[in-house]
Structure formats: structure tokens, C-alpha cells
């Protein structure tokens, strides 16, 4: 069921910036987003970038020690969100980076919010083409353990996530 909610151009621009890894200067790389949250606009008609809810690549190792743990703390207790997380992980064969689409719908979120976010998920996913991994979580227990994300990225083949062994 479609909700009629539109995806803002800002969301698509952020996605394209995160997806394309063109050769960049070190300064440009630092400004690239590692994680972002998307929310519904106040009138519930658009999916927009949530202001101030992002981690930049340049923050990692500076103001952010563990990007995944910091990302999990950004998720609201009592409302739904969509998120993009640029996961850096290692398998037995190689190092990889992949974007993960996350649908956060905590059990404590209002029913109306859960319904709108669930019915709008296809709209945002259609705009974010080429995402290989998706994670849906309904409580912090499902996201705080990095093994849950590693499972989505490649199961037992993944040996570390964000430089931390599993």
C-alpha cells in the first residue's frame, strides 16, 4: 500500500553523494556522510533529511570513536526513521564498503507513525536504487549488536565491522 508520501530531492542527493565513491580530495572524503537519518516532514507529506542527525566520515576517529554505536544512539526511542549507513567491513577475502538501508520502527512508536513509515518504505526504496542490504529493527536489542548488521552484510564471512572484530 502506498502512502502518497513523496521523497524530497535532498534525500536523493544525500543518497547519491553517499553511493558514488569518486576520487575525492582528503577534505571532500571527510565531508562524506557515514550515516544519516531520514524522517517525515511535519505535515507527513515528504520524507526529508533529519537535521543534525548524521555522522561524517571525517568525524570517525576524531569526535566519533565507534561510528556504529554512535549511529545506534541517534535512533529515537519513540518514533520511526529510515536511515542509510555506510558500512565498512572485512570478510576473509577482502575489505568492503556497502550502503545499508535501515527501517527503524520501535515498538514504543505511535501506531499511526508505524503505519505511515511502513507504507512509505517502498517509496523511498524505489528512489534509493542499488542498495544491496536492508535491515529492519523494532528495538535496540536488534541493532545494538553489530553482529546483526554483519549477518545482513555477509553472514559468517564477515570478520570485522568498522574495524572491530566480531
Swiss-Prot record:
A GO cellular component annotation here is: filopodium
Name the CDD domains on file.
ADF_cofilin_like
Any idea which residues bear Phosphotyrosine here?
A: 68, 82, 140
Write the gene name.
CFL1
Q: How does it assemble?
A: Can bind G- and F-actin in a 1:1 ratio of cofilin to actin. It is a major component of intranuclear and cytoplasmic actin rods. Interacts with the subcortical maternal complex (SCMC) via interaction with TLE6 isoform 1 and NLRP5. Interacts with C9orf72. (Microbial infection) Interacts with human respiratory syncytial virus (HRSV) matrix protein; this interaction probably facilitates viral replication.
- Modified positions (Phosphothreonine) in chain numbering: 25, 63
Q: Per UniProt, what is one Pfam family of this protein? A: Cofilin_ADF
User: Where is the crosslink of kind Glycyl lysine isopeptide (Lys-Gly) (interchain with G-Cter in SUMO2)?
Assistant: 132
What name is this protein filed under? Cofilin-1
The sequence motif named Nuclear localization signal is recorded at: 30-34
Species source reads: Homo sapiens
PTM comment text: Inactivated by phosphorylation on Ser-3. Phosphorylated on Ser-3 in resting cells. Dephosphorylated by PDXP/chronophin; this restores its activity in promoting actin filament depolymerization. The phosphorylation of Ser-24 may prevent recognition of the nuclear localization signal. Phosphorylated via a ARRB1-RAC1-LIMK1-PAK1 cascade upon active ligand stimulation of atypical chemokine receptor ACKR2.
Q: Name one GO molecular function term.
A: protein phosphatase binding
| UniProt entry keywords in alphabetical sequence | Acetylation, Actin-binding, Cell membrane, Cell projection, Cytoplasm, Cytoskeleton, Host-virus interaction, Isopeptide bond, Membrane, Nucleus, Phosphoprotein, Ubl conjugation
- Residue numbers of N6-acetyllysine PTMs: 13, 73, 144
Record GO biological process: actin cytoskeleton organization; actin filament depolymerization; actin filament fragmentation; actin filament severing; cell projection organization; cellular response to epidermal growth factor stimulus; cellular response to ether; cellular response to hydrogen peroxide
Q: Please name the InterPro entries in this protein's record.
A: ADF-H (IPR002108), ADF-H/Gelsolin-like_dom_sf (IPR029006), ADF/Cofilin (IPR017904)
Any idea what job this protein has? Binds to F-actin and exhibits pH-sensitive F-actin depolymerizing activity. In conjunction with the subcortical maternal complex (SCMC), plays an essential role for zygotes to progress beyond the first embryonic cell divisions via regulation of actin dynamics. Required for the centralization of the mitotic spindle and symmetric division of zygotes. Plays a role in the regulation of cell morphology and cytoskeletal organization in epithelial cells.
Tissue range of expression?
Widely distributed in various tissues.
Topology versus the membrane: Peripheral membrane protein
Q: Per the similarity annotation, which family is this? A: Belongs to the actin-binding proteins ADF family.
Record's note on what induces expression: Up-regulated in response to enterovirus 71 (EV71) infection (at protein level).
Domain named ADF-H: residues = 4-153
